[in-house]
């Protein structure tokens, strides 16, 4: 199990600027939070989601592959940091 935060550098308000993922050992997303520039949070888990958030349809690439893409700045985060973002995004929904 690992946790990832990825800052997405762009100017399109329709897309999130932060992507938070909980990953299993094969790098499949278990839970995901998308944070938008206006402060909106969407989330996905299993068959439930808000907004347009969806879990990836394939395993995420290795950290190094994400990091070499100039539009993304990834960092590994702790379970506690992910859970704080998850609680903020889901409120009483999860």
Predicted stretch roles:
Residues 9-11, 26, 38, 80:
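Generic structural motif
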Residues 8, 33, 53, 71-77:
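Alpha-helical interaction segments
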Residues 24-68:
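Acidic, aromatic-enriched beta-alpha/helix-loop junctions
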């Amino acid at each position: 199990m690992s946790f990832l935060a990825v800052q997405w550098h762009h100017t399109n308000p329709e897309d999130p600027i932060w992507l938070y993922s909980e990953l299993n050992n094969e790098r499949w997303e278990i839970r995901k939070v998308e944070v938008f520039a206006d402060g909106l949070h969407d989330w996905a888990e299993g068959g439930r989601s808000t907004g347009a958030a969806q879990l990836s349809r394939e395993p995420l690439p290795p950290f190094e592959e994400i990091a070499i893409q100039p539009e993304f700045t990834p960092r590994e985060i702790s379970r506690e940091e992910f859970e704080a973002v998850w609680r903020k995004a889901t409120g009483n929904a999860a």
